[in-house]
Amino acid sequence: MLKTIATKIFGSRNDRVLRKLNKVVKKINGLEPAFSALTDDELKAKTAEFRARLEKGESLESLMPEAFATVREASRRVLGMRHFDVQLIGGMVLTNRNIAEMRTGEGKTLTATLPCYLNALTGKGVHVVTVNDYLANRDAETNRPLFEFLGMTVGVNIPGLPPEVKRAAYQADITYATNSELGFDYLRDNLAHSKEERFQRQLHYALVDEVDSILIDEARTPLIISGPAEDSSELYIAIDKLIPLLVKQDKEDTEEYQGDGDFTLDLKTKQAHLTERGQEKCENWLIENGFMTENESLYSPAKIGLVHHIYAALRAHTLFERDVDYIVKDGEIVIVDEHTGRTMAGRRWSDGLHQAIEAKEHVKIQGENQTVASITYQNYFRLYEKLAGMTGTADTEAFEFQQIYGLETIVIPTNRPMIRDDRTDVMFESEAYKFQAIIEDIKECVARSQPVLVGTASIEKSELLSNELDKAGIPHNVLNAKFHAQEAEIIANAGYPGAVTIATNMAGRGTDIVLGGNWRAEAAKLENPTEEQLEALKAAWQERHDVVMKAGGLHIIGTERHESRRIDNQLRGRSGRQGDPGSSRFYLSLDDSLMRIYLNEGKLNMMRKAFSTPGEAMESKLLAKVIASAQAKVEAHNFDGRKNLLQFDDVANDQRHAIYAQRNDLLDHEDISETIKAIREDVYNEVIDQYIPPQSLEEQWNIAELEKRLKQDFALDLPIQQWLEEDNQLHEDNLRERIIASAVEEYQHKEEIVGAETMRNFEKGVMLQTLDELWKEHLAAMDQLRKGIHLRGYAQKDPKQEYKKESFQMFTEMLDALKLTVIRTLSRVQVRTQEEAQAEAAQQAAAESKDYADDSASGERSVAQTTQRIGRNDPCPCGSGKKYKHCHGNRAAHEA
């Protein structure tokens, strides 16, 4: 109450920010006459002037009015578009690490040029982040003439580029890229074996387009680079035959209720659970089919992997639907993004789920993968020094943006008043009645030449509605994951008089639907169009535009409410752009997913009783409250899930930072001998401590085992017992010094044979490869720890604290293992002179009567490893960083 009164008196926080920014807008407008009078060369020279002023200590904030005035004038001359005042406000909001909510059609692409130019003046690079390749290319090509006029370079980074092209894109002042490619390049950079292989420079400023889609909808999707793991495709095929034998049970077993089913489903979390009866049935089937013996249990340590396969197959059959969650295309399972309706080629579900779905659909099962590197979008984008975003729908998620990313959401006013008619939701008892009403609404719109955009929640529903429209004889276009290639053309035609377009969720997002159609898209199809042709296209468009305006603009039909209000608002936002007329209405039924999953049986029964006659439509304030309540529950549940994920991932993120910082330090230094020296001393001291405890008596020493360990692990054959017998003055400290000195002497001897440069390369290669291998194993161990950590709650322990504690212990153990493995590998490598290598080669040739060409016949000294000492998977001693089997080991085998 008091807050409402205060807001009325003083205005909201948003109002106060806008009032402050309007003062700067007046200042920019005041500069316009002077900047309009500048010649092109004088306007271009402003970029060099601004950079010089920055170097002298001026801030970006003080340069902002002049920089924005420069961009506005350049845009007017080059693109023929002048920034509106509200776009200047949007640009200022984006400069100040905020999120700008700008309605559809308000010109976000043009607005982005302002903060991009300003932040690119620093020379540190700007990343404009889009959700797909099409938008990255489109926006870059649209704004390239403007930026190049002002002396800025523009790059585009999308999947599949050659390394040199990708590297050049990152060196540009302004780089347009997809969110996934930026994240993957970051991971690739941290798997590189030389600094020349890296792509990204310092992460300075990111402007995220459709920020809600990337930072919220995809927040729980980790980016993973993986390598092959053990193949178990036959097991997936076998287990797939078990699932149809299992029977669903509606409720979990309790003391009061004992069901007769084999499994239960949790539709909210998309999880399946076996009942006791189900476990017994699975065990019996596994025994009958030879996967287990009668003495074994499904949960015995040796068979626990079978549980993983059963649950993956169970989820594949019961919770993931074809043409809803995925499609089958060219013999592969392709995931469909639940938020956008777009396919996500190249992405795979983890934990064996993707393989289980491949078995279910009888397509080729691709091997499981082991994670080599991973990061979430939440943690990747928090690496940027400055982060900003823009979207048409952010205000409903403002709290989450503030909590997770520290970004304030500012709602930018529209250039013209929004006059769209958002009508009350209509509820029907069943989906069949709902579709009948939708068809009637579409018929009425088509009759008066009003274009219609129908939003559906899945491919399945879009095709079902398409069939109904075919029966009714209504021409229409379908835009879903199956017709992704035709997206731009379908959207370009969606504003034609009487056009009917069915789209899954927000397929086509990022492209405006122009009333009357897009004449520019038509012009683009013509080869070298004449002025007369262009004028004819414009005239035809104007005629169609007037017809659509008179009919009421674009009409939006939602076929069901989404889990999030934001997605519903995105659908509505396709209509009423830049003051155009428009309308929207959602048609709902009690069969909709939101109703079935998130409303209890009592509320559903109460609503069913409200329908007195078949096919009756219901509109009421109570209905709106029930739907809002269900959506609020889902949004809160999803926010908690993302926040919980971040809290766990932050633990791994701290470790990731430490490892990647260490790795980059290695790449940036040619000589790491001092690091190796320090590690060697630590490792030998720790090993010696195990057999000669500090401040212990000589009787407590285990010299025989120490000699054995040094020889076995470090190829160091030292007569320590003999030293002690010959020298009574030897005590713990000077004995320790003598052992380490012997190790150093042995290592220096190897270095003298092969040369310092070769040894430095070898040290670096061993260090990098060992670090990568142990980090990969650590990620797998962390993943297993995380999957089971929730069980600690049953022991009255906080799972998050337990996870932090145990993961830190595992990380410490990994670092210790890194030191030991590096020193062990460097110590065990055997080197020999060129003459020795040639002599051995000659002996082998004589013994086997085969020609053998020595790889190092150039006369230079080289590193070689004996087969007893270096395994095929050990680092190659040449210093390449590759495994021996992929480097000189492979070459030697080929030549032999």
Swiss-Prot record:
SUPFAM superfamilies: Helical scaffold and wing domains of SecA (SSF81886), P-loop containing nucleoside triphosphate hydrolases (SSF52540), Pre-protein crosslinking domain of SecA (SSF81767). GO terms for molecular function: ATP binding; metal ion binding; protein-exporting ATPase activity. The keyword Cell membrane applies. It is found in: Cell inner membrane; Cytoplasm. It comes from Mannheimia succiniciproducens (strain KCTC 0769BP / MBEL55E). This is Protein translocase subunit SecA. ATP binds at Q87, G105, E106, G107, K108, T109, D512. Transmembrane segments: none annotated. The keyword Flavoprotein does not apply. It is a peripheral membrane protein. SMART domains: SecA_DEAD, SecA_PP_bind. May bind 1 zinc ion per subunit.
